[in-house]
């Protein structure tokens, strides 16, 4: 549990910085929501509602056959909104300001992909570069090493330690089978999902 919290600290703290911090706000979504690397890199603004504090996971960015491709995420759970704790809303608002600045500086060279997390010219971020940036962030924070993929387990462990129902953890991490998350139980209302993420957000603020 302590290891999980320590791993979350660098992304949360850096997400609140107002300087030209690139990719670090994406790490907050990876760490807090357990988003997969391809999912956070494929996140689009049209599927983000900051006022309602929720988002949908609609695409993934992956490298296939030597080129970057965007693929649709089609599962039953991907069609449901994922509620955002305040720390994620803050990170996304800061990211929007950063991207607006990038767009203005790029001028006619800006490529409008609709993606939330992009390069300075609007193009998709190379997944391998995302991994390298994440590794540097963790090393600089002097916390136990954790990979981008490993953050999903960290997030799941944190939610379990907060006594969040396994079915809710399944909703948040969008696993297709409850066995992947933990055990079975009964159906849980969507309000429980939002409450679980609020608990996680409160934990990060303490």
Language model features: what each stretch is:
Residues 52-58, 147, 158, 170-173, ...:
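Short functional hotspots where side chains directly engage DNA or cofactors
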Residues 38, 43-46, 128, 154, ...:
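Structural detector for helix-capping/boundary residues
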Residues 17, 52, 61-88, 94, ...:
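C-terminal secondary-structure termini that scaffold catalytic or DNA-interacting sites
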Residues 13, 59-61, 138, 173, ...:
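Hydrophobic aliphatic residues
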Residues 1-43, 50-51, 63, 75-79, ...:
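Basic, Lys/Arg- and aromatic-enriched nucleic-acid-binding interface segment
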């Amino acid at each position: 549990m302590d290891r999980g919290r320590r791993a979350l600290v660098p992304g949360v703290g850096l997400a609140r910085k107002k300087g030209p911090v690139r990719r670090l706000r994406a790490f907050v979504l990876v760490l807090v929501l357990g988003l997969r690397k391809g999912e956070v890199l494929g996140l689009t603004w049209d599927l983000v509602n900051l006022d309602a504090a929720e988002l949908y996971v609609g695409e993934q960015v992956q490298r296939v056959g030597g080129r970057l491709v965007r693929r649709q995420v089609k599962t039953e759970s991907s069609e449901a909104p994922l509620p955002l704790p305040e720390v994620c809303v803050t990170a996304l608002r800061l990211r929007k300001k950063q991207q607006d600045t990038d767009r203005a500086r790029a001028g006619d060279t800006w490529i409008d992909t609709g993606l939330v997390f992009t390069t300075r010219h609007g193009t998709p971020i190379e997944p391998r570069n995302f991994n390298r940036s994440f590794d540097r962030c963790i090393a600089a924070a002097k916390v136990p090493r954790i990979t981008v993929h490993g953050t999903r387990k960290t997030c799941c462990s944190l939610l379990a330690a907060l006594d969040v129902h396994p079915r809710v953890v399944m909703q948040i991490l969008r696993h297709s089978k409850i066995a992947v998350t933990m055990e079975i139980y009964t159906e849980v209302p969507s309000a429980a999902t939002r409450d679980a993420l609020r608990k996680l957000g409160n934990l990060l603020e303490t």
